[in-house]
């Protein structure tokens, strides 16, 4: 299910085509939005983009892990991790696209 990777340049090009800003302004807009999201997350704020997702930092306590090769117990230090939780709207869009893609593939196989 490997697909195309969307880059900052792709986002800027999309803004350029849809909004009508110059390519430079579009790239600056994309950078500014990404910077704002990163800064908010770094400050420990929750970033909620309605109908898309929520990003937040979560504290993970120290725990005991295991070396898979030796089976030896290894302490894993406490740390902060970023979590991404897709909204229900995004989940439904993904499911709908997946279902449509599967139906299309099934139709192509039947026509062969």
From Swiss-Prot:
GO molecular function: DNA binding; structural constituent of chromatin
Gene3D superfamilies according to UniProt: IHF-like DNA-binding proteins
GO cellular component: cytosol
Signal peptide coordinates: none
Keyword entries, A-Z: DNA recombination, DNA-binding, Transcription, Transcription regulation, Translation regulation
Any one of the GO BP annotations: positive regulation of metabolic process
Domain of life (superkingdom): Bacteria
Transcription regulation listed as a keyword: yes
Alphabetical list of InterPro entries matching this protein: Hist_DNA-bd (IPR000119), Histone-like_DNA-bd_CS (IPR020816), IHF-like_DNA-bd_dom_sf (IPR010992), IHF_alpha (IPR005684)
Pfam families linked: Bac_DNA_binding
NCBIfam families xref list: himA, PRK00285.1
Family membership: Belongs to the bacterial histone-like protein family.
UniProt xrefs under HAMAP family: IHF_alpha
Quaternary data: Heterodimer of an alpha and a beta chain.
Task performed by this protein: This protein is one of the two subunits of integration host factor, a specific DNA-binding protein that functions in genetic recombination as well as in transcriptional and translational control.
Record protein name field: Integration host factor subunit alpha
Gene expressing this chain: ihfA
